[in-house]
Amino acid sequence: MQTPVPTDNPRVKPIAHDGAPWFARQSVETALLAGAMALPLAGLLHAESAPERGLIGLKYLDYLDSQPGEPRIQVRAKALLLMTPISSDWSIGGTLTSDAISGASPSYQSSALTRMHDERHAAEGDLTRYFPNGTLTLGASLSSEADYLSRGVSAQATRSSESKNTTWSAGIGFNSDSINPTNGVVRNERKKVTTTLVGLTQVLTPRDIVQINLGHSSGKGYFSDPYKFADERPRDKTGNTLTLRWNHHMQTTEGSARMGYRFYRDNWGIAAHTVDLAYVQPLAQGWTVTPLIRLYSQSAADFYVPAAQSSYPFAPFTTGPYSEDQRVSAFGARTFGIKVAKQIGPDWLLDLKFEQYGQRAAWRMFGAGSPDLAPFNARSVQLGMSRPF
């Protein structure tokens, strides 16, 4: 289980508000460790006995986004993961992450690029107790950079039926963030977010597993982006998620189809849909190939100011919240990717993953996108290696 880390740090410059590709929506620490949710399940089925061997892994991420004629943000990140059993009933895990972010980000809408550079260092740890029919995991995290400090704690429990075909899960996480932007727009701002998750995983057949998760988040404090012109967001934010997953094993090819859907809605007026499709195909000599597709769509926040109504270089003439940030506009996005993995000998596993992301107002589903948004593209390359010990 990954402990929650900040997802609203403006220096990360995520593409979308929620449900966008993992490499853009979350902070880089989470991206490298595949933490797509604040309280993710460790898998569709949670092991109920401590692993017999430990695991060590390295990850490297190179991410670059761009708009027409202008490269924007580049992220290069490294992570070290370690997990080891400490008895037949206990295991501990930890992750150290370091990343460098550089490039330019729009000050408003998708124009007026401003240069930026930042480095981040993060550490996460968790302790798991295994019971005959369940687990309990406690976690903590710390993420630090020049203008942002985040501290988090979390707890997650699972409980399985006697047949092991049904697993219930519940988790809670708390994050406390301190924000001190280098431009001095605000000083000593705070943000606190609590996230809860309940889930059910069910084995339907020897080849089918389904899962449903319900999530809720509630936060208060500073959610604005101090590096953007005309950005004054509400100081409270609540959101709910519904996540559905289905894994199906193909008997004829020995491959597995993985399908997922996620719905998100918050009190800012944003409603988002995410559809994930992936197919894992084992090949000869230890090779595995996984093509993937992700479709995303969101509505605009109630306080989003479209480009046509922008009063730049003056703030919008309104007494309420406002933002010209395209991340809270209405748009659609498409991600295409492929992952190739190679088992080397009995222990070493190498993997290489490539994803290409595109964002357009015209791609929004269930309604029109926000007008005058520039096309946005991003690509990420992730290299990993791991082995048990």
Where on the chain are the PLM-derived regions?
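Outer membrane beta-barrel transmembrane domains
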Residues: S111-L113, G215-N247, F263-T274, G286-V381
